[in-house]
Amino acid sequence: MSVYTSVSDDEMRGFLSGYDLGEFVSLQGIAQGITNSNYFLTTTSGRYVLTVFEVLKQEELPFFLELNRHLSMKGVAVAAPVARKDGRLDSVLAGKPACLVACLKGSDTALPTAEQCFHTGAMLAKMHLAAADFPLEMENPRYNAWWTEACARLLPVLSQDDAALLCSEIDALKDNLGNHLPSGIIHADLFKDNVLLDGGQVSGFIDFYYACRGNFMYDLAIAVNDWARTADNKLDEALKKAFIGGYEGVRPLSAEEKAYFPTAQRAGCIRFWVSRLLDFHFPQAGEMTFIKDPNAFRNLLLSLG
């Protein structure tokens, strides 16, 4: 999370007039993350997370917010959205789409244990199953068409080796996207910093703003690529096994899904290598921003062989 849009105390008081959350106390920017402006909001009724959306449009928000409400009602550990007095889940702040969600207990981790990987994998499978009857749709905005378009923009700023690697991987994936596999609503960004933990247990998944329809192996691979990734950008096989084991304890994988998983891992590497390259070479302006190392997923991709 980052802060690109600054919000004054007076703006916040006006915003809160649309909610039954008591009086404004304080607002603290959250520097972690890369896409939206995020704050911890404290009022006389409690603590919340405020998100001001820098890319998503107002009409797109109901999908994400209703999804969180749906999952919360199904027992999935998520940050439930807070409704306004008029019943809406989305709002406007500083001329941009915005929302409030519950502030969950727990914290993220940079060094997960096998137990934490196991329980996170299990909760991801529970999420996949719980969203099966969610009625709204969202296509994946950062899949193969986006990779291809972004690649063309990036080629002039990449080294010859990186450009060749990126182009060859995108070309290899274009006819192998896993569209034949079980699919549904996926988180699509379940990195370690998007999961709050309380000891070994999951207290909540957060930041669903890349959620969309996709194949479950792609979602699982994105998560494993981060949760089992070591400091030198290789995979810890014990953490990978624990994560997938937790997932399969809730939703067993077919032989076809298991066979596709290595390809899904490569697709996950491309998606985040590309997005980090864009953030690095074409950064957004903001007062508190956080750009992640784009080489992490290039190096992980190379380590996969």
From Swiss-Prot:
Enzyme Commission (EC) number: 2.7.1.39
Keyword field contains Amino-acid biosynthesis: yes
SUPFAM superfamilies attached to this UniProt entry: Protein kinase-like (PK-like)
GO MF annotation list: ATP binding; homoserine kinase activity
Record key words, sorted: Amino-acid biosynthesis, ATP-binding, Kinase, Nucleotide-binding, Threonine biosynthesis, Transferase
Stored Pfam families: APH
Protein name, entry field: Homoserine kinase
HAMAP family documented for this protein: Homoser_kinase_2
Source taxon at top rank: Bacteria
GO annotation terms (biological process): threonine biosynthetic process
Pathway of action: Amino-acid biosynthesis; L-threonine biosynthesis; L-threonine from L-aspartate: step 4/5
Reaction(s) this enzyme catalyzes, per UniProt: L-homoserine + ATP = O-phospho-L-homoserine + ADP + H(+)
Naturally occurring in which organism (per UniProt): Neisseria meningitidis serogroup B (strain ATCC BAA-335 / MC58)
